[in-house]
């Protein structure tokens, strides 16, 4: 039997995310359970919280406003992917994850892969040359080994760009960490969604 308190935690966590009072979904879940005094209850999954965040966003913005928000996020992705495709000779950018589906709830982070032989430093310099702020450099330990990443923001939207050497990471629709299927959108597909 499902415990309705689990859903109460999910809803409260969504409210915390929507009001920017939590840095991550995990933090929001823990804070919500604590605030409600539910210490012996199964915690909700991240997906359940995201559904509540999406519902709150649609309630606040209306369906047209939510659709505009999705388009705004896609435009940020399209701009950075266009810069990469046109300015880095062999680059093939790919939007991955929930944003590729148009799900922009819970403090969206755009996950962009760029398949290229160019160094992460060259990719970063290209972005700076095109007016982006200096990105932060990171490394991720994935199923394919250690991959270089850039973290930056555009119009208040966080972008996490992962450089994928084509000879190491095949172009695929799988999560780099879990190997599970993940939604993707090429630049051409993204442009069709925006048309």
Which sequence ranges carry the predicted segments?
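Catalytic core of pol beta-like nucleotidyltransferases
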Residues: 2-107, 116-195
